[in-house]
Amino acid sequence: SEYLVRNWLREVEEGSVAKPKKPQRAQAPWDGRPWAVNFGEGASRCWEDGRRWGFVSAGGGDWYVRTLKNLSPGDLVACVIPAVGYVAVGTVTRSVSRADVATVPTDEGEVPYLELDLEVDNPGQFLDDPDDRLAEHIVLVDWSEARPSGEAVWKKHMYANQNTVTKLRHADTLEALRHEFVWPE
């Protein structure tokens, strides 16, 4: 066997030292609260409805809906509209359910979600999907503070994630949200 090897060696130039790694964002230990919940607006949902009626929602694929199942009554959530900012903090009051079977408490009692006076034209998008992968799902939330999207809180380096529901433990974001919002007791 023959080996052909060639080394290119050069003198180390002054100042050509490897750059140090970028520091990681500070993370607080996660104690089960709060969760960050993305509220993506579109044809089947808008933040004004979620704010008015007390819910977060997702649909259009299993990837979007799956993490809603992490939320349970009593969980604290911070709601963020992607590319806009944080708009609400509240407590989950009812676990995830399909939009076509969900009911929402109103002054007149429990009303089916699809019968609410909603701003969107198609709140029941994909409800004909038999295996739930596309159907719109909602989780009810009692907002301790909920703002219009025009008053969202966003500062450089705040926590954002593409998943619908994630653990919120980014220390700087938690501090900013505790300063900006009224939190439930």
Residue ranges and their predicted role:
Residues 68-72:
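Short, well-ordered loop/turn sites that connect or cap secondary structure elements
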Residues 1-37, 41-42, 60-63, 101-185:
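Contiguous surface segments at macromolecular interaction interfaces
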Residues 80-86:
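Short, charged beta-turn/beta-strand-edge "cap" motif at the junction between a beta-strand
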Residues 78, 91, 140-142:
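Beta-strand cores of modular interaction/reader domains in eukaryotic scaffold and signaling proteins
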Residues 86-97:
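Short beta-strand-centered aromatic/proline hotspots
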Residues 42-58:
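Short, basic/aromatic beta-hairpin or loop at an interaction surface
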Residues 41, 81, 94-96, 145:
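Short, flexible loop/turn elements at secondary-structure junctions
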